[in-house]
Structure formats: C-alpha cells, structure tokens
UniProtKB/Swiss-Prot annotation:
Intervals of motif 'HIGH' region: 57-67
Domain of life of the organism encoding this protein: Bacteria
Organism encoding this protein: Listeria innocua serovar 6a (strain ATCC BAA-680 / CLIP 11262)
Example of a GO MF term: zinc ion binding
Cofactor binding note of this UniProt entry: Binds 1 zinc ion per subunit.
Official protein name in the record: Isoleucine--tRNA ligase
Lineage, highest ranks first: Bacteria, Bacillati, Bacillota, Bacilli, Bacillales
CDD domains cross-referenced by the UniProt entry: Anticodon_Ia_Ile_BEm, IleRS_core
GO CC annotation terms, alphabetical: cytosol
Length: 921
C-alpha cells in the first residue's frame, strides 16, 4: 500500500496562477452576455436607493492612472452598496464639448475657415464620440460595472435640451446678465483664448517703478505723498484705475530728498538700493487696511486712481502696492468690480490703442511700452526702469504674446444667491472634512461666473437680440429652443436662420420690424457638466436628485463640485449632492507628477495587459486615496504579492473542501472545538470591520484587514496546523469536518467581502466553489454580522494563547538558527508556566503539539524550573529539544509509538488506526 494514497490532499480546479490578462475578458464577456448589470438592478429593485453620480471625464485622450483611480473607487462603492441592501444604479458619463476637441480637429489639418460652423461642429461631435468609445472600452476592461449602453454624454440632444432649461431658469430668476471681463486675448489671432490654448515662453519686458501722488489721504497720508507701484506691462498704465494694497501688510511712509513715498515695510531693504532710498528715513508705519479708499492721481491723465484692499497684493516682489487696470487682469477686474471702478480696456481686437487712451491712439500695445515710459519720465513719475526676462503667456498657435483684455461676456451672478450657496455647502457631508472649508471659502470669495465662450464647439447660449439691442430670454423662447435641441441637437442653432429658431409668430416690442439676431457665443463647458443634476439625475427614472454621492479628484472643488452646486442651488434651492468625497492625484513612485517629458507615465491599459485589472483595482484599494497616491512598477509588484497571498489562501481553502458538503457535512457552531469557534469569531469580527470600512469608504483599511486575516490568522496559524487534521484524519472524522466547516465559511465570507474590489477573481472563486450554473457572486449580498455564543470569553482565552504561541515560534526560530533542530516537526516544546498562563492552559482544550506544529509538547508548572537555556518572556519559558521517537511515514510527526501495529511498522498509532479502519479492504 502507498500511504501517500491514503492522504486527503487538496484538490481544486482553481489555478494557482491568476492569468488575469487572459481570464478577465472571459468573465467580462460572460457578464455582458448574461446582462449582469441589469440582473443586479432587478435583484435590488424596491430596495432603498443609493445614487453615486458619475462626474464626466473629458472625452479626449487615452485613460491614465487618475482615471483608473477615480472609476475604481466609484465602482467599489457602487458594488458594495449593491451587495449591502441598496438599489445602486450607475450611469457613467462624458464631457464632450470644449477647446481640446477643437484643437484635436485642427491638428488633423482641417481648414476651419473653409467650412461652416455647423460642418466644423459635426467633425467635433464625430471625434468626441470616437473618444467616448475608446474610453468606454478601457473602463469596461477595468471591470467597471455600469449602464454602458446608456451613458450620459453632454453632446446628446436630450442632455443639451435640459441644459438649456437650467440656463433659462437661472435667467428667469435674474441671475444671468451681460457685462465686461478680461480674458486671454491674442492680438495675433484676433480672438479670445482659453487657458488650454496658452503656453508660457520667456519674454524680455520693461520693469518700471512708478509714483502715484496722493490727492486725498483720508487722514492717514499727507497730500502729495507718493505711493510706489511696480509693473512689467507699462502699456497698461493708460488703463490704470487704482492701486491695490494688502490689508494685512504693514506699509511705511519714508522720506527721501524732500519727497514722501509709501512701500511695504518688508520690501524696504531691497528697495533702498534699487530706488536710491539709501538715506531715506521712516516717518510712520500704517496697516494696509488703513489705506483703503485713499485717492491718488493718475500720472498723466486727469482722473483719480483709488487705493483698494486686496489679498493678491503681496510682499514677495515689487513694492507691495499693485498697479490695477480692471480691463487688463483677472485680479484687477475682480477688485475693480468690488470697488465699482470703470472696466477700461482701450485696445481693439488687433491690440491697437483706441481713442480711450489719448496720446496713444492707433499704436500697437507692445510699441506703446516705450511711449508710456517716456511719458512717465516726462511727468516725473518714473522712479526706475530696467529690463527683466520672465515667463509670459503666448498663443500656442502663433507663438506671439497674449494680453488680458476686457470684452463683453455673459455672466451668472453669484452675489444674487451666494448666501444660499454657502448654506448648501454647510448642509453637505464632506470627506475629507477640509473639503467643506475649501468649497465654502471658494464660494464666499468667488466673483461672478463668466459663462460665455467665443468658440464653436459647445452648447449655444440660447439668446436672441431685438432690433434695439435688447437681449431676449423668455420662457417661450427657452422652451422652444430646448425642444428644438431635443429633436435636432444644438447644431440646429448654427444651421437655421434666426426666424426658424424663434417660436412661430414671435413678436417683441424691441423689434417693431420683426427683425432679430442670435447670440454666437457658446456656454462654458463647466455649465455643461454642471447641469448633469438636471439632465441626468432629474431626467432619468432610475436616478434622483440630490444624489447620495459625488466622488471626484480634489481639483473638482473649483470645477464640477462648484459648477454643479451653483446651477443646482440656483434652480432648486439645494445642493445636488448629500455627500462629497474627493481623492488625490496619481503620482509616480517618487511622488512626481506623471508626464511624457519625464518619461514616468504608467498607463492602466498597459498595466492591465501585463498584470490584470484586479491588480490595478487592488492597488486602488491599497492606497490612502484621499491624499495624493503613488504608483510604479515596484509598487504594483508589492500589490501583486499581496494578491498572490490572497489567491493562495483561497486556493488552499477551496482545495481542502473538495469533499465537503455544507448541508450534510457541516458541523454546528456548538459542536465545534474551541479553536474552530475562535476562527469563526475572528471571521465574524472581520465581517463587521470590513463592512464598517466600506461604509466609511476606507478601502485601504479593508486591504490591510483582509491581507492580515489571510496571512496571520489563516496562513500562519489555522491553515498551517490544519494540515495535520484535514490531510491525515479520516475523511468523515469530526475534527476534519469541523475544520472544513470553518474553511467553507471563510472562503464564502472572504469571497463576498472582496467582490467589490476584485470582481474577476472572486467570480472565479465563486464558480469553483459552487460549480456549474453558479449565480454570479455579484448577485449575492454581503455576509451578516452574527451573534456567536461566548465570543468574548473564547476570544480573550485564544488571543492570550496566540501571544504565547508567538513566543514558542520565536524559540523554534532561534533553535533552527542555532542548528538545534531542522524542521519544527522534529521538535519537542516544553513550556514552563506560572500564574495566569497556567490557568489559561488548564482552561484550553486542544492538542498543543498540533497547535504549535511540533511533534511533542509538555507543560511544566513553575518558571523557576526552566533551564538556563530556555527562551524566556512574560509568564512563560520555552525549552526546545529534539522530539524522541521515529518519524511516522504518513503524518511526518515524530512519535514514540511508531511501529505499534506490526502490520504497519512505519506508522504511528493514530495513522495505523486510520489506515486499518478506512483503507484496508
């Protein structure tokens, strides 16, 4: 007889190697064929809804690790909720308008000027949809479960129709108006540019220090005192309307050569030499806040220049007092509006001065730099001029410098409902908590929202103009345009004449002759995605507003979180979300931003081909995503190692229950041994902790909890000593069936707990466990937390035992290193105990040699009896010696009774009994 044939070795069809790159697409095809997404929705129909609303990625370019991080977090949440008693549909979306798509079309060599706007827009739409298709394939390959056949896409007619309604409702409430605001303007292209069309290059500019004389010091400064400003754009001096100082900085009045000057105290040391103030004396110090509304005179025009308080004035460079031209700068404009200054931008589209800048009419702005400095010198206001090289914005097409220039734009007034916005922010639950402060401060401090863009590819502003120039936005026109867009798409705006866009028979007092024109600007793309609560949450029957969760990168506080909040509060009075969760950015292994120039980009598509989607997903679960996260080949290697441990644990469990039927072979809890109960209690604790962590979106905690359970509780303890039972004992022995009961519970529980994170691997485990015709793991619910008898008492006892077991393991390791023993199975452990440890061992039941994975065990009372050589630590001493006896051929345990049965001279008594009873015919 071959004794090895009497061993009950593990058997499973679950392979050791995951082969994920090849296996995952097979599962995905099966899920699609079986309509798994729809089945999950059917299973959860009627349950409480939990709606995670997808922030739309931009439909341009290959998916990067940021996409993978974002979509995987969302998918884990939705899968968790779907297994936790909620109905949690997931509708993915895409943001499809805007400049990058126009640029991509231009790069293909399309001659934009040789076609109509409508034709150009059709090319943009086609390009956007191919990008959507490419990204959709990538997201599906990542294992993201959602309604991929019916996503929301911002260019679809039904979406645009709802966006028009949002605009109309805001206009109806008086929140939409036309005004002036500075934008990047390219004189060389004669057009406004978005930030994406700007590139920075070095440019040499005149750097000048200019004195503005005080005419009304408000009791703080004497008349005739000079406030000194610094600028690198002398050409903007003709548009100067004010000076900005920081309210929280200290400024000094100094006297030099009979003149008084005001500069920031912190900058005085550097300015003494630069401006020849070496001998200047400090007359007084004033706070920036005290200078608010002091009046100075423009250096060469007969008008006032008002001193204002603004945070953007700093003591980092210059003088601490900032020349302010509201028509030529973002900060200048915002503070100019706050102080009600004229928004003067005396340049035409080509960058040439108009008659609004007397003395410079018809001069190109760059040429005017020299003329302005000469004029300042002539009037005695120029204190210093030098040349500096600095990084300056250029038009990425023409490579020529751009300017800030105020032009007429459409705005959404934030002031009109700012208090409602702030109250809404306070009513939302933010994770991380700092998100609330961040958005609250942003909303509190933000100016009005410029919603118009002078571009072609976007949703048209649905505005008509009467003969007298009056803008027409009425319920009638808005509803009509909304329905036109719903039927034909927004291209109809560019394809039809005005009369064919207006409702039949439309009249307006401002157009006595019945003539109208239409707006040519489009909406800011943030208005597109910011309307999704109306176009998706409110419009789709399976969804609802407000959503339970918005979850995006931390850059979306100023983006989608902000625009969505603005439009939702404007039209509904409440936030579109109950909870907001944000994640950081994906950086390389050294914490650097990924970029092609650094050559450190890692693309999810490539990683999935090499390692599989479940490895990418496990990486996402392993990181503290609320901060910036790192990813590299080395980090993914570490994650793969954890995956391997989890997979091996599953394989061991599956292999050792191949002859186990839970219905007929399962052992009830009360009939289990204490050590088996202890493992089920630990498993139950894991269920509670993991479910709590899912609920708190703390996936890295789950990663560590499950990894720890598989590695420590199972691999290093229970599964290790179990081999002496499940391989060796008779198939139907009580102890073997008890351990198989625990194994079965463990594999079922772990598979369910891991399903949201590792959807492919857990499906494979589940199919191996249940067999042919198994219903998907993703149609199961998460395990419940059970109430197990005597759990506290059993846990306390066995936790204490595990600490002692650690000491025994250390002693065995020491003995191996000292060559006292080879394998631990050759050892005898003698344990010397006192006090609590003695009481503990008296109360424990079990085969301690088996539990310590040694051949022999002896318990001796009295630490004082331990020999010098014993390994000592709190309350116990461990002596390791070589076990006496022979090694049993079947179980490999060293026993004194080997050969007790003469028919089986190489077997111990236990093995001989098993063989005789169960294997001898």
């Amino acid at each position: 007889m071959e004794y090895k044939d009497t061993l009950l070795m593990p058997k499973t069809d679950f392979p050791m190697r995951g082969n994920l790159p090849n296996k995952e697409p097979e599962w995905q095809a099966k899920w699609e064929e079986e309509k798994l997404y729809e089945k999950i929705q059917e299973k959860n129909a009627g349950r409480k809804a939990y709606i995670l609303h997808d922030g739309p990625p931009y439909a341009n370019g290959e998916l990067h690790m940021g996409h993978a991080l974002n979509k995987t977090i969302k998918d884990i949440i939705v899968r968790y909720k779907s297994m936790a008693g909620f109905s949690s549909p997931y509708v993915p979306g895409w943001d499809t308008h805007g400049l990058p798509i126009e640029t991509a079309i231009a790069k293909k060599g399309v001659k934009r000027k040789e076609m109509s706007i409508a034709e150009f827009r059709k090319l943009c739409a086609e390009y956007a949809m191919t990008q959507v298709d490419g990204q959709r394939t990538g997201f599906k390959r990542l294992g993201i479960n959602g309604d991929w056949e019916n996503p929301y896409i911002t260019l679809l007619p039904e979406y645009e129709a709802e966006q028009i309604k949002v605009f109309g409702e805001m206009a109806k409430k008086g929140y939409i108006y036309k005004g002036k605001k500075p934008v990047y303007w390219s004189p060389s292209s004669e057009s406004a540019l978005a930030e994406a069309e700007i590139e920075y290059q070095d440019k040499t500019s005149a750097s000048i220090f200019v004195a503005f004389k005080v005419t009304d010091g408000k009791g703080v400064l004497d008349e005739g005192t000079n406030i000194v400003i610094w600028t690198t754009t002398p050409w903007t001096i003709p548009a100067n309307m004010g000076i900005t100082v920081n309210p929280d900085l200290d400024y000094v009045v100094i006297e030099s050569a009979g003149e008084k000057y005001v500069v920031a105290e912190a900058l005085l040391p550097s300015l003494r030499e630069k401006l020849g103030f070496e001998d200047a004396t400090v007359v007084k110090t004033v706070r920036g806040s005290e200078l608010d509304r002091v009046v100075t005179k423009h250096p060469f025009y007969d008008r006032d220049s008002l001193v204002m308080n603004g945070e953007h004035a700093t003591a980092e460079a210059g003088t601490g007092a900032v020349h302010t031209a509201p028509g030529h700068g973002e900060d200048d404009f915002l503070i100019g509006k706050k102080y009600d200054l004229e928004i003067l931008a005396p340049l035409d589209d080509r960058g040439v001065f108009t008659e609004e800048a007397p003395g410079f009419e018809g001069v190109f702005y760059d040429t005017a730099n020299k003329m302005v400095t000469e004029k300042l010198e002539e009037v005695g206001a120029l204190l210093k001029m030098e040349f500096i090289t600095h990084s300056y914005p250029h038009d990425w097409r023409t490579k020529k410098p751009v300017i800030f220039r105020a032009t007429a734009q459409w705005f959404a007034s934030i002031d009109a409902f700012r208090d409602d916005l702030l109250a809404a922010v306070k009513g939302v639950n933010w994770t991380p908590a700092w998100g609330e402060t961040r958005l609250f401060n942003m909303v509190r401090d933000r100016g009005d929202w410029v919603i118009s863009r002078q571009r072609a590819w976007g949703v048209p502003l649905p505005i008509f103009y009467a003969e007298n120039g009056e803008a027409i936005i009425t319920d009638e026109t808005i509803n009509h345009i909304s329905e036109l867009f719903r039927e034909h798409g927004s291209n109809v705006w560019f394809e039809r004449d005005v009369k064919d866009l207006l409702p039949a028979g439309f009249t307006h007092p401002g157009s006595p002759n019945g003539e109208f024109t239409k707006e040519t600007d489009i909406m800011d793309v943030w208005f597109d995605s910011g309307s999704s609560h109306q176009a998706v949450l409110n419009a789709r029957p399976e969804l609802s507003r407000p959503a339970d969760l918005y979850m995006e990168g931390s850059d979306q506080y100023r983006g989608w979180f902000n625009s969505s909040l603005t439009t939702a509060v404007a039209i509904t009075g409440e936030a579109p979300y109950r909870n907001v969760l944000s994640h950081g950015f994906a950086l390389d292994g050294e914490g650097r931003k990924m970029s092609k120039s650094l050559g450190n980009t890692l693309l999810p598509g490539k990683v999935i081909k090499q390692l599989g989607a479940d490895i990418v997903r496990l990486w996402v679960a392993s990181v503290d995503y609320q901060a910036d996260v790192r990813v590299s080949d080395e980090i993914l290697k570490q994650v793969s190692e954890v995956y391997r441990k989890i997979r091996n644990t599953m394989r061991f469990l599956l292999g050792n229950i191949n002859d186990f039927n839970p219905t007929t072979n399962g052992v009830s809890y009360e009939n289990l041994r204490e050590v088996d109960k202890y493992m089920l209690i630990k498993l139950n604790d894991l269920v509670k902790n993991v479910k709590d962590s899912y609920e708190a979106f703390e996936f890295s905690t789950i990663y560590h909890q499950i990894n720890n359970f598989c590695t420590v509780e199972l691999s290093q303890f229970y599964m290790d000593f179990a081999k002496d039972v499940v391989y060796i004992e008779a198939a139907d022995s009580h102890d073997r069936r008890a351990m198989q009961t625990v194994f079965y519970e463990a594999v079922v529980t772990l598979t369910k707990l891991l399903a949201p994170i590792l959807p492919h691997t857990t499906e494979e485990v589940w199919n191996s466990l249940i067999g042919e015709g198994a219903e998907s793991i993703h149609l199961q619910d998460l395990p419940d937390v059970k109430v197990l008898a005597d759990s506290e008492e059993i846990t306390a006892k066995w936790d204490a035992f595990m600490q002692i077991r650690d000491n025994v393991q250390k002693a065995l390791e020491f003995a191996r290193n000292e060559k006292l023993i080879g394998k631990s199975m050759l050892a005898k452990v003698t344990l010397y105990v006192d006090g609590e440890a003695k009481t503990l061992f008296d109360s424990l039941e079990g085969d301690f040699a088996q539990l310590f994975i040694v051949s022999d065990f002896e318990l001796v009372e009295g630490l004082e009896n331990a020999p010098e050589s014993a390994f000592k630590s709190n309350q116990v001493a461990v002596q390791i010696t070589v076990a006496e006896g022979e090694t049993c051929e079947r179980c490999r345990v060293v026993k004194k009774d080997v050969g007790v049965n003469p028919k089986h001279p190489t077997l111990c008594g236990r093995c001989a009994d098993i063989v005789v009873k169960h294997y001898e015919a």
